[in-house]
Structure formats: C-alpha cells, structure tokens
Amino acid sequence: MLVSQRVTGARARAPQLAGLLEAWYRHGRTTSSYSALSEPSRVRALVYGNHGDPAKVVQLKNLELTAVEGSDVHVRMLAAPINPSDINMIQGNYGLLPKLPAVGGNEGVGQVIAVGSSVSALKPGDWVIPANAGLGTWRTEAVFSEEALIGIPKDIPLQSAATLGVNPCTAYRMLVDFEQLQPGDSVIQNASNSGVGQAVIQIASALRLKTINVVRDRPDIKKLTDRLKDLGADYVLTEEELRMPETKTIFKDLPLPRLALNCVGGKSSTELLRHLAPGGTMVTYGGMAKQPVTASVSLLIFKDLKLRGFWLSQWKKNHSPDEFKELILTLCNLIRQGRLTAPSCSEVPLQGYQQALEASMKPFVSSKQILTM
C-alpha cells in the first residue's frame, strides 16, 4: 500500500515537473539532453562533487531542469536502490566513474512524462530503466537520451522493476554463460543473501539446478536460512560449516558443483574452489572481503579448475542493446510467473538518504535500501 500511495502521488505531481539537469551538467550530453524550450523547474537529486565516504560527500540538492527536445525523454523517477556498486562508485573504487559532480545511482525505474519529436520507441506512461551504469537515478526526475533507456513492462511489481537491471541480469548471465549446466546439476555460491545471491537461487530453481548457498554466520542465521530456502535454496551453510567434514554428506545427494559464484574473495573463495568438480569454473563478480582470490597450485593442476570474472557493464559492451533487452524480457517473464521476486527491501524517502546510505553499508543487513521519490 505504501508503494502504491507513493507511486500514485508521484504520478499526480508529474505534470507539474519539467525536464533537464542544470547548466553544470551540460558536458554530459552523452546520457542526458538539455533544452531551453520551457521555463526551468527544480528537482531534487543526490549529488556528490568528489569521491569519499558516501555519508559525507553525498548531498541532497535542487537542480534546474528544462524541457525536452529531439531524442530526449523526460522521466519521473519512481524508485531506485542503493547497490554496492553505487557505494563503490561514490568512493572512487569502481571500473566506471562518471564525471564530477555526478548524481548517484546506477539502477532504478522511472515513468516517461514526455518525449521529444524524434523519439520512436517510448511514449508517455511507459516504465523505463537505465540501459547502462552511471545514469544517475537518485533524483526525482531527469531528461535522458532515448538510447540511455530501456522500456519495460508495467505489469511487474515496482520493487522488482527498480531492482531488475543489475543483480538479476548478473545472476542469469553467470548461470548460463560459463558452464553448460543441465537440470539436476549443482551450483555453489557465497554471499548468498546478497541481491545477486537471492536472484541466483530463484533463477537456478527455475532452471531446475540445485544450489549450495554459503553465508556468514550471524545472530539471526536461522531466520536467514529459512528465508533463502523459501526462495528455493537447496542447502544453506555458514562459511564455518562449509569447512567441516560433515559437509561431504551433501554431495552424496547431488553432484559436485561445476560452477561456483564468488562475491567475497579471500578464504571464502578458496573454500568454493575446494568443492568444485574437476574441470569446474569459479566466476568472481565481487570482492566484499577486499582480499585476493587464492587458488592452490594443486587445485589448478590436478582438478583443472578455471577462474573467470564477470562484470555486467563489460557484457553489455560485448553484446547489442537488443540482446540486453531480450535478457530483460526473459527476467520479466520469470517475475510474472512468480519465479523471481525482488530481494528483501526497505523503502526510504529520498530525503532520508543518509539513513539509507548508512544502512546499506552495515554488516549483516540483508534488506536492500530503496529510495522512493
């Protein structure tokens, strides 16, 4: 009900809001467009002028926007999550960094308010998500170029739409692209309670794959275990339990994993490698422990294990926009079927961004922070 009320309010206010980022963003027309066809209006945005601690460098500012023209699309943002990649980008520790000052946020969903005369694929009322990282979604509205956006169906839940473009896409590609897995095969992963981890569990279940899910021990471990099993997890283990000899009993009931998904690094990634089948692949897509991946010589030689990396932004560079759109539609179908849900989310109004940023950086917080506009 809260989401519904906010979205309704956003739509009611939308006609009063008009289009484009103020003059100091004019150098960024590759993703945003600017026009002086109407009187400027003010919108709110979370802006950082230098890299550092997000709690210190991110500020809520009023920015001037003007009307759309040509291939521009005026978007009213509805909701946008805070992801680890957003935090890393603000800190300056990411593979893609926008010019400063910049608006935070790589993911989110918005509704089209108006389009320029040469826009062909979008119309007012459509829901859209960013086509690439670095768009700056933590704002009430903006005007972007048509090519910077992808239209999505409006018949999926708002939280699912807001969290669609990064984590589920990463999960799907890793499950499909690195090993030719068949129904009944198994996958092992760490950081299983993360947004990607929860998507891996659900997509793997839809593909009839078994999952062994590793998490850090915590006071509410039973609650977390039950929640992951409700999503479709076959086994949930703490990192300590994975090291115990009793873990071998798991592999009496299912084949050794041919695919491991690593978001942690350090000792956790070494344990994943130990449990891989000969010839298996470990894909690293994050490094939460800030420690290097360590693979013993014996594992590489005698088990012929493969170490790979995955970054969704690089995948997009190597594939056409149509292929990304096809991926999005595949995931939307899973959402419609009830086989893929949004991660556990906590909605926070944009003005409460400091609380949301702090919560997103705390350990053992499984709820994703969603900024609502």
Curated annotation (Swiss-Prot):
One of the GO biological process terms: ceramide biosynthetic process
Consequence of gene loss (knockout): Homozygous deficiency causes placental insufficiency and embryonic lethality between 9.5 and 11.5 dpc.
Positions carrying N6-acetyllysine: 61, 252, 267
Active site: 94 (proton donor)
GO cellular component, one term: cytosol
EC assignment: 1.3.1.104
SMART domains the UniProt entry points to: PKS_ER
Principal subcellular localisation of the protein: mitochondrion
Catalytic activity entry: a 2,3-saturated acyl-[ACP] + NADP(+) = a (2E)-enoyl-[ACP] + NADPH + H(+); (2E)-butenoyl-[ACP] + NADPH + H(+) = butanoyl-[ACP] + NADP(+); (2E)-hexenoyl-[ACP] + NADPH + H(+) = hexanoyl-[ACP] + NADP(+); (2E)-octenoyl-[ACP] + NADPH + H(+) = octanoyl-[ACP] + NADP(+)
Tissue: Expressed in Purkinje cells (at protein level).
Residues with the N6-succinyllysine modification: 61, 252, 267, 316
InterPro entries attached to this UniProt entry: ADH-like_C, ADH-like_N, GroES-like_sf, Mito_Enoyl-ACP_Reductase, NAD(P)-bd_dom_sf, PKS_ER
GO MF terms, alphabetically ordered: enoyl-[acyl-carrier-protein] reductase (NADPH) activity; nuclear receptor binding
Taxonomy, superkingdom: Eukaryota
Stretch forming the transit peptide: 1-53
Keywords carried by this UniProt record: Acetylation, Fatty acid biosynthesis, Fatty acid metabolism, Lipid biosynthesis, Lipid metabolism, Mitochondrion, NADP, Oxidoreductase, Transit peptide
Chain's role: Catalyzes the NADPH-dependent reduction of trans-2-enoyl thioesters in mitochondrial fatty acid synthesis (fatty acid synthesis type II). Fatty acid chain elongation in mitochondria uses acyl carrier protein (ACP) as an acyl group carrier, but the enzyme accepts both ACP and CoA thioesters as substrates in vitro. Displays a preference for medium-chain over short- and long-chain substrates. May provide the octanoyl chain used for lipoic acid biosynthesis, regulating protein lipoylation and mitochondrial respiratory activity particularly in Purkinje cells.
Subunit structure: Homodimer.
Homology family: Belongs to the zinc-containing alcohol dehydrogenase family. Quinone oxidoreductase subfamily.
Protein name: Enoyl-[acyl-carrier-protein] reductase, mitochondrial
Protein source organism: Mus musculus
Lineage summary: Eukaryota, Metazoa, Chordata, Craniata, Vertebrata
Gene for this chain: Mecr
